Amino acid sequence: MVEISRWALVLLMLFICSATAAEPDEDHHIKLTKEVVASEDIISQLISGEPVRYDNVTISGSLELAELQGSLSQPIKITNSIFLGPVRFAAASFDEPLDLQGCIFRDNVNFFGCRFAGGAGFAGVTFEGQADLRNTDFGGQASFLSAQFSEDASFRNSQFAGDGIFLNSSFARDVDFDFAQFQRLASFADARFVNVSFLETQFGGHTSFLNAKFHGNAAFAATRFAGSVVFREAGFLLGSTFGLSSFGGLADFTNVYFNKTAYFGGGKFTDLAYFVNARFDGDLNMEDSRLYNMRLDNVSLQEDSKINLNNADFTKLEVRWAVIKDRLVYNGAAYLALVKNYKSLEWFDDADDCYYQYRRIGQDQAPWGWGKISDLISWLSCGYGVRVSYTAFWCLFTILFFGVIFWAGKGMNKFEIVGMELPGDHRLRPTARVSFTDALYFSIAMFTTSQAPVNTYPVGFYRHLAMAEGILGWFFLGLFVVVLSGVLIR
């Protein structure tokens, strides 16, 4: 029994040793079997028309097809491989799909002027050098899913007839899509950019920048979005420019973060512009823009952030006045347009507050003259016609003021009559000084009816004050009725 246990222990130790020794041998075997293919061999296959299929190989040398005549009609599939030298396929035409999924390009890549009739697969590709894809024609789907660009890249003036997929792609340096055209879906969701430019780029289908992050300057100048575009959850950490851009469908900027100035000057939104819960740490410039329906519900603005609506034309702008009242750049036309907008939304309190601030700022900026004096009177008396409380205050103040004057100055007497009360009767006799209640009652009567109560009459100079109070009463009561009608009857 002891002998059997001893042999079992020996066999177990031999098994463990063999397994431990086999592990590095296996890794070494994998490294040795990674095939190295010369670029000349691939060029020969391409020229001869042979199908090109490689996986997990290392391609040495420079891969150039500058002298190739005609198009490449064979399928080309090189996946999970490493290109050590530069790759140049300038002006090449690929009739069949090109699949370079998972490859790594150590040097520069040039596909300038290429035509991909069957689509191009660059999913998971890493470009460690510069990537030149200018004037490229993608006839089918162009997939750059999770592609990484370590140096500058350019898709300038490229045509995307199929879907353009840049989902989860990363651009560590500058990239431009200037004058490019996307006829169908364009997806940049979860993409990462430093400096990116979409100058006069045209997006014909649905476009998505969902959760994209722009760490540098993002330029969408004169960009045309024919369909809906989604920037939901995106972050613009430096400047963002959408000047002269046009949005033909829904523009979704929900929960977007703008760290610097967001410039939409001259932009055109023909459908709903949705900025709900957006955050602006800089300014929002909508100068000269055209807005059909813009929603700014629950937006977050810094204390020094400004909103510029100068010369903006908007049909419907949904944002509460309390959110923008201290941040709106003053422009008379913009304020009056906002007043009209609030009235159409039936936000009458917001309309009144907006109009009040418009008049107040205009009054402060106006030079001294009759116009400014009339504005001061309008401000103090009725709050430019939108503050009925101002007029009510002056009514009560006038009554109380004159009541105190009449009482404190002994400016009125109260007469009593023995027997019948007859005007001018010799039996009328003055009593002692009137009480404050009687003086206040007299002031109310003069303010509302301009007629003194029976047996109460001002004396001396106070008769003129009573007449003045009657005139002020007619003025303030008439003003009160007008302002109250304007506030209550919409």
Residue ranges and their predicted role:
Residues 22-375:
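N-terminal leader/targeting and pre-domain segments
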Residues 388-410, 471-482:
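Selective detector of the "anchor" transmembrane alpha-helix that sits immediately C-terminal
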Residues 8-18:
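Bacterial N-terminal signal peptides
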Residues 348, 364, 402, 411-414, ...:
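Intrinsically disordered or highly flexible coil/loop and linker segments, enriched in small
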Residues 404-420, 483-490:
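Juxtamembrane/interface segments at transmembrane-helix termini
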Residues 370-388, 415-472, 479:
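Pore-loop/selectivity-filter region of tetrameric P-loop cation channels
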Residues 336-339, 469, 485:
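Short, well-ordered alpha-helical packing segments
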Residues 1-8:
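Bacterial N-terminal signal peptides that target proteins for export
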